[in-house]
Amino acid sequence: MICNILFMKKILLAFDGQHFSKGVFEFVKQMNKHQSVLATGISLPAVDYVELLYSYGGIPAGPIYINDAINVDDRLVKENIDRFTELCKQNGIACKIHNDFTKHVLSQVREETLFADLLVISSKSFYENLGEETQDDYVDNVLHKSECPVILVPEDYKEPANIIMAYDGSSQSVFAIKQFSYLFPEFHDKQALLVYIDKGKSDLPERANIEELISGCFPRFSIFKLKIDARKDMEQWLISNGDTLLVAGAFGRSLFSEMLKKSFIKDVLHHHKVPIFVAHK
């Protein structure tokens, strides 16, 4: 059976119903310009949205203490849902709203991701709801519960001019690169940078294979060695090369993972608001 290449992607947008994310909608709007999408909004109560972020952010198991007295403004929730559907209509985007959950919210969202191509979350909400002490643990555990790839989008999202692909030779990093390539063919003409950590080896793992894989989708690609004692080099590259998107696998506790946590997540992703695409298998 041959799959029709012009299929409609199903995109999940998980958001706190009391806050509308301009960045998330801009991302979906840009996707729809390249290929039709079905935007499925999952409107969660504030308390459930915070729990979703904590759980998908990989916070250690245990009780989450959230103010039970959070006031939910039903009028504001309805206004934001109406705003979302109206904007979708104005931009020719097929959309649905799911806000009637019969299961525990995390089980429901995980089930939704099983039948979706991509989950989109506002990185602004993510960082506002995670304390400083938990942000450094983000990459190792990010969104392991999702059954589809995930992208964290900043509020000032712009279509990237450059794609950075984090590579450590692991199957997870290769899987993330492949998933990104499948989902975003419109980015194949962008400048791509394969980044790996120089641990004293003469070459990167499986060089011929990874070059063949990337060159087939991203003809304008180059390789960047990130030296162990030069993490700031990567930050400087991000700052000096315009709008950038980072592609990463769900790394284990490798050296690359430790470097990403300390340099990318806390400094680059937070302060410079770079969108990050994460996929795991």
Model-derived segments and spans:
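Structural beta-alpha unit
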Residues: I2-F7, A46, D82-L119, C217-L246, ...
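Small/aliphatic-rich secondary-structure junction motif
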Residues: I2-I64, K145, K158-L226, D243
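Redox-cofactor binding/interface segments in oxidoreductases and associated redox assembly factors
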Residues: L13, I121-S122, M165, A248
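Short secondary-structure boundary segments
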Residues: S43, S123-K124, G249-F251, H280-K281
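A short acidic, glycine-rich active-site loop
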Residues: P63-K78
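Hydrophobic alpha-helical segments and helix pairs
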Residues: C95-L152
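Flexible loop/hinge segments that line or gate small-molecule binding clefts
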Residues: L152-K158
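Short, flexible loop segments at boundaries between secondary-structure elements
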Residues: K273-K281
